[in-house]
Curated annotation (Swiss-Prot):
The gene is trhO. GO terms for molecular function: oxidoreductase activity, acting on paired donors, with incorporation or reduction of molecular oxygen. InterPro entries: Rhodanese-like_dom (IPR001763), Rhodanese-like_dom_sf (IPR036873), Rhodanese_C (IPR022111), TrhO (IPR020936), TRHO_N (IPR040503). The lineage of its organism: Bacteria, Bacillati, Bacillota, Bacilli, Bacillales. This is tRNA uridine(34) hydroxylase. HAMAP family: TrhO (MF_00469). Belongs to the TrhO family. Catalyzes oxygen-dependent 5-hydroxyuridine (ho5U) modification at position 34 in tRNAs. The keyword Repeat does not apply. It comes from the Bacteria. PROSITE patterns: RHODANESE_3 (PS50206). It is an enzyme of class 1 (oxidoreductase).
Length: 319
């Protein structure tokens, strides 16, 4: 039995004073020795925390004693250690943002909820568009079979992508999904206000689908990206596959790294060997960037040799 747990949760509910709430909530979390990242806004709370089984159970009881969160659903993962290094509780304007001029309130308008078994049926329906509401790098390490991959790097870019592809989506039955459900609550609501009539969402997100006893994560390929030190977790209990591809050579890969150029910081899939070979950088420009955090530890001679090994030159060698 694992000694730790990771809790993923959210709740759209009114929090009148997010700043005061955040300060008091941070103190409570630290007292329970939790670590994680929590966002609070007048529209609700969105969090992931890790801690011992005892501490996380205590936290769930603590939240249940607040009427605003009494029915909040926690997605629980067993863990061997903390999934975060620190504890942060931050007040925000929104707990998830689509950068809309007029925000959508999921308590007033949202897509129809599909339970995991209903969602699996939708996956098998050729007349249904399954739309991934996550970022491109999340999709690349794992997604539902046949799902559409929006070319976005941030959730707030999604409405623009929809408008650019409105013709292909018009009059279609749309079912959307995300990690735990919070993004889809707002996104599906926006779709309805934007003129799409038949809009549904996976209730509880991928995390719930993967733990469902009936679906067991079937028809999910790869792993699910998570925003903590685990990076990705398994979902498909039936016939797991690897869909991630190494950024450098296209071989199967589920290992994410960040480009060592802090001004880029792009997330890419790369093996340990290719991380070393390509100096943990996504491009030549990033490899030779003066702020590169990987190459700054190399001598000038080694840096030059490593570049030459991949048929590249350092800036001073270019005439």
């Amino acid at each position: 039995m694992s000694d730790y747990q990771v809790l993923l949760y959210y709740k759209y509910t009114t929090i009148d004073d997010p700043e005061t709430f955040a300060k008091e909530h941070l103190a409570a979390c630290k007292e329970m020795e939790l670590k994680g990242r929590i966002l609070v806004a007048t529209e609700g709370i969105n969090g992931t925390v890790s801690g011992t089984v005892e501490a996380t159970n205590k936290y769930m009881d603590y939240m249940a004693n607040d009427a605003r969160f009494a029915d909040m659903v926690f997605k629980i993962d067993a863990a061997d250690a903390h999934a975060f290094k620190k504890m942060h509780v931050r007040p925000r304007a929104e707990i998830v943002s689509l950068s809309l001029e007029e925000d959508v309130n999921p308590l007033e308008v949202t897509g129809t909820y599909l339970e995991p078994s209903e969602f699996r049926e939708a996956l098998l329906d050729e007349d249904t568009v399954i739309l991934d509401a996550r970022n491109d790098y999340e999709f690349d390490i794992g997604h539902f079979r046949g799902a559409v991959r929006p070319d976005i790097q941030n959730f707030r870019e999604l409405p623009g992508w929809i408008e650019d592809n409105r013709e292909q989506l018009a009059d279609k039955k749309i079912v959307t999904y995300c990690t735990g459900g919070i993004r889809c609550e707002k996104f599906s609501g926006w779709l309805k206000t934007a003129g799409f009539d038949d809009v549904s969402q996976l209730h509880g997100g991928i995390a719930t689908y993967g733990k469902n006893e009936e679906t067991k994560g079937e028809l999910w390929d790869g792993q699910m990206y998570v925003f903590d030190e685990r990076i990705a977790v398994p979902i498909n209990q039936v016939n797991p596959t690897i869909v991630g591809k190494d950024y450098f050579d296209g071989t199967p890969c589920e290992r994410y790294i960040n480009c060592a150029n802090p001004y880029c910081n792009k997330q890419i899939l790369a093996s340990v060997e290719n991380e070393k070979k390509y100096l943990r950088s996504c491009s030549h420009d990033c490899r030779v960037h003066p702020a590169n955090l990987y190459t700054k530890n190399l001598s000038k001679e080694e840096f030059t040799e490593r570049l030459q090994a991949i048929n590249e030159s350092s800036p001073e060698m270019v005439q």
